[in-house]
């Protein structure tokens, strides 16, 4: 049995289908634009095959899709420029990881919730290394070091990109002694520093006192939204290297509502900062 098509293909293909249907085009009409048979269009729309940037632009232009939305889809469908951080870590970045990395780099807004761990984008190298060392498997010390370096490159690229990032962090993550007390203390201090230095980053702590909440039972949630493309989005449950992707508009809307409820249940950014500073002392 074959697996599901890659999430980036599903996201782009689903968008193409919606745009085509919105203007009343049939598969045959789209096929005439690319001078191909209708089966190729069908496979593209269902994510069974990819599409070249030139062909993607041709379809999007014919469908009347605004330029900003076109650019977002082309970025999602591509593999990034030569300077993209993931090209330096081919042995670490799996196909699944690459899908997420490319979508993350194209996103204009990232929303993340973690119950027990500090999210990847906010971790120190020491914290990341402690997690890597605890994972099952037979990775060598060098491979773990490379994984930490890849994560650091990813953080630098994403945090330095000016995109909005909203994080809701379970209070338990501030007490889970990943790597020991010293590593945890350094990690909390790093959160305080990031909060002060990154104006596009908002950190909120979901306190133990919040009780049951909109993400109860979910350990990890990330939502990506894209510039000038209100109909595009991806919700991801689980680790970057695996997990489940949901890209339908209904699913993304449901998780956006859940994240809004999480934010409402969490401490305000100011109160969260005070908690972090108190723990960092």
Locate each region found by the language model:
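The short coil/loop that forms the "turn" connecting the two helices of the helix-turn-helix
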Residues: 25, 36-37
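C-terminal regulatory/effector modules of DNA-binding transcriptional regulators
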Residues: 180-281
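Interdomain hinge/linker segments and adjacent boundary elements that couple functional modules
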Residues: 2-18, 22, 28-32, 46, ...
């Amino acid at each position: 049995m074959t697996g599901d098509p890659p999430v980036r293909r599903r996201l782009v293909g689903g968008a193409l289908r919606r745009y085509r249907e919105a203007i009343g085009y049939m598969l045959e009409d789209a096929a005439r634009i690319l001078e191909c048979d209708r089966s190729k269009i069908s496979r593209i729309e269902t994510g069974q095959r990819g599409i070249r940037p030139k062909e993607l632009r041709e379809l999007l232009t014919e469908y009347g899709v605004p330029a900003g939305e076109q650019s977002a889809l082309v970025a999602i469908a591509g593999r990034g420029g030569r300077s993209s951080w993931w090209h330096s870590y081919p042995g670490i970045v799996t196909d699944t990881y690459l899908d997420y990395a490319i979508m993350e780099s194209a996103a204009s807004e990232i929303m993340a919730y973690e119950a027990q761990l500090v999210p990847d984008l906010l971790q120190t190298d020491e914290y990341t290394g402690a997690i890597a060392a605890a994972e099952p498997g037979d990775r060598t010390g060098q491979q773990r070091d490379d994984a930490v370096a890849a994560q650091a490159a990813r953080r630098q690229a994403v945090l330095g990109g000016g995109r909005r990032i909203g994080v809701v962090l379970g209070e338990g993550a501030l007490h889970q002694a990943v790597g020991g007390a010293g590593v945890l203390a350094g990690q909390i201090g790093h959160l305080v520093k990031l909060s002060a230095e990154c104006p596009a980053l908002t950190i909120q702590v979901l306190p133990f006192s919040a009780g049951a909440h909109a993400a109860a039972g979910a350990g990890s949630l990330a939502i990506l939204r894209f510039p000038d493309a209100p109909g595009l989005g991806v919700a991801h449950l689980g680790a970057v290297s695996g997990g489940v992707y949901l890209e339908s508009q209904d699913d993304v809307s449901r998780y956006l509502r859940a994240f809004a409820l999480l934010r409402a249940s969490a401490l305000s950014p100011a109160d969260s900062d005070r908690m972090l500073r108190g723990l960092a002392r």
